[in-house]
């Protein structure tokens, strides 16, 4: 807050403390123009001397007031520095939140990419299962044929008799060939099963790792959200305090304007009563109040003197 606003606020408080009740009491004691009477010149000079003494005391009070104003201005400057530091801290925190949002977006993109890779591996696993099922069917078919060939020896003999085979060993060789084919098929099926098991193990490890990463990111996001909520609550509190300070300053400025206007009106009335030229600025409220106080004090003293003389005359 600026120095001008501080001076106006404390000046209003000063007017209220120094002149509020005393000015009202003096005005109540002040007699009407018709009831006034001329006083001796000597008495008037004495009253002016007393007024000068009072004016000197007022000047001392003004100096005390100015020292108080300087102290308050230093305090307000410190408050302004702290306010600037708070705004800078809030700006840095907002930048920190923005950077963490960008990190979260990158983490989500990475998680989406990992999920797509997981789906691709699942498709590969399903394809391997289908191939394995086909191999099993082929194995079953060949096993059934082998069983048929090994059981019926007579049938083999008849086959030798009625076919191009001349000996049973040729049929056996044919059988061994089929057995070898069966072995190869079984080995291929086993290798396919091992591939499936390895793929399942890799998939389980990958899923566990990604679940841990997602949990860590969620915990980090929750912690950052809590810090953000606390910072936002602090910002709301400081904004409310700042609005209260601005409203209070506006009210005091309005009160000060009213006091200055009333002082100026009263000063103009006093100037008319004095019927002499006064060289006081319209903005110099302090000097206007000093002249008003001096005028009222003079009139009060004159009135007291008149009352005293009237009482003496009545007693005589």
From Swiss-Prot:
The keyword Coiled coil applies. It is found in: Cytoplasm, Perinuclear region; Cytoplasm, Cytoskeleton; Cell projection, Cilium, Flagellum; Cytoplasm, Cytoskeleton, Microtubule organizing center, Centrosome. Residues 43-151, 182-236 form a coiled coil. The keyword Coiled coil applies. Pfam families: DUF4200. GO terms for biological process: acrosome assembly; centrosome cycle; cilium assembly; spermatid development. Keywords: Cell projection, Cilium, Coiled coil, Cytoplasm, Cytoskeleton, Differentiation, Flagellum, Spermatogenesis. Its main location: cytoplasm. GO terms for cellular component: centrosome; manchette; perinuclear region of cytoplasm; sperm head-tail coupling apparatus; sperm principal piece. Belongs to the CFAP73 family. Interacts with ODF1 and ODF2. Interacts with CCDC38. Interacts with CCDC146. Interacts with CFAP53. Essential for male fertility. Required for sperm development. This is Coiled-coil domain-containing protein 42. It comes from Bos taurus (Bovine). The gene is CCDC42.
């Amino acid at each position: 807050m600026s120095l001008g606003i501080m001076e106006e606020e404390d000046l209003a408080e000063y007017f209220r403390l120094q002149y509020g009740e005393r000015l009202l009491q003096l005005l109540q004691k002040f007699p009407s123009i018709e009831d006034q009477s001329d006083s001796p010149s000597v008495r008037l000079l004495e009253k002016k001397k007393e007024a000068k003494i009072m004016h000197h005391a007022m000047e001392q009070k003004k100096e005390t007031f100015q020292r108080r104003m300087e102290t308050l201005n230093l305090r307000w400057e410190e408050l302004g520095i702290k306010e600037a530091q708070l705004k800078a801290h809030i700006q840095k925190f907002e930048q920190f939140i923005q950077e963490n949002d960008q990190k979260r977006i990158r983490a989500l993109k990475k998680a989406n990419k990992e999920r797509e890779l997981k789906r691709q591996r699942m498709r590969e696993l399903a394809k391997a299962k289908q191939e394995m099922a086909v191999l099993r069917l082929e194995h079953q078919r060949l096993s059934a044929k082998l069983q048929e060939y090994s059981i019926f020896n007579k049938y083999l003999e008849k086959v030798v008799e009625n076919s191009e085979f001349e000996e049973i060993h040729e049929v056996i060789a044919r059988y061994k060939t089929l057995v070898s084919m069966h072995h190869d098929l079984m080995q291929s099926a086993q290798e396919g099963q091992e591939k499936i098991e390895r793929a399942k193990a890799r998939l389980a490890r990958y899923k566990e790792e990604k679940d841990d990463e997602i949990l860590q990111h969620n915990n980090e996001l929750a912690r950052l959200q809590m810090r953000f909520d606390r910072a936002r609550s602090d910002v709301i509190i400081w904004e409310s305090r700042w609005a209260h300070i601005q409203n209070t300053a506006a009210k005091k400025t309005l009160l000060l304007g009213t006091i200055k206007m009333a002082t100026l009106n009263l000063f103009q009335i006093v100037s008319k009563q004095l019927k002499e030229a006064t060289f006081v600025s319209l903005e110099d409220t302090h000097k206007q109040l000093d002249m008003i106080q001096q005028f009222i004090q003079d009139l009060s003293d004159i009135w007291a003197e008149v009352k005293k003389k009237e009482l003496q005359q009545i007693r005589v």
